[in-house]
Amino acid sequence: MAGGAGSRLDMGEKPLVKVSGKPMLQYVAEAFIGAGCDILIITSHLVPMTKNWCRAMGYDTYNASGTGYVEDLFECIRETSLKGPVFSCVSDLPGITADIISEVFETYRSKGKPAFSVWVPEEYFIEAGCTPSYVEDVESCPACPVGLNIIDASMADDAQDEYRFLFRKPELAYNVNCKKDFESFLKFIERDKLGL
């Protein structure tokens, strides 16, 4: 998902903001490709440079209306006739890896529910110096969604029973929405040597 304006970060089009010399969107795209997924990047009129970058990289795109995250996702599902399990992921999650995606999908398959969301403990956000947008108890733990989900596209027009997965992966707490988040993630890379 790369169609939002990303105005809070104030560093140009957010998907193209570079971490260690590479756009954040590229980390996300390469992680999904590395996990064996076909990717379709949802863009909009709000991110013309991102659309051009995707074209240059050879990534397939869908140009949505730019109304909002959920609206653009479901517009894409309807217009492209996607079926079966579909990942959605924010473009500003540079700590994501192919191994994380593979583990998430295996857990999704084991739970037997059509919808699946990934959460990490709130304490990870606090330790990271990032501000969570939403907190709810998951498995008796205050937790925050990370922007990585799976839905059954075949049931896109229906309410879907959701499994909330508490995933203890600190790197997923870095959903880069503002300069403070960005700076915190750079420090995390240095401290934990993710190899980005």
Regions found by a protein language model. Name each.
Residues F87-C89:
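Short aromatic-hydrophobic micro-motifs that form the base-stacking/packing surface
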Residues I96-K180, K187:
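Conserved core of the sugar-phosphate nucleotidyltransferase
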Residues S91-P94:
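The conserved acidic donor/metal-binding loop of glycosyltransferases
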Residues L9, T50-C54, C76, V104, ...:
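Hydrophobic packing residues within well-ordered alpha-helices of enzyme cores
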Residues E13-K18:
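Short glycine-enriched, charge-decorated loop/helix-capping segments at active-site entrances
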Residues E183-L196:
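C-terminal catalytic/acceptor-binding lobe
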Residues M1-G12:
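N-terminal nucleotide-binding beta1-loop-alpha1 segment
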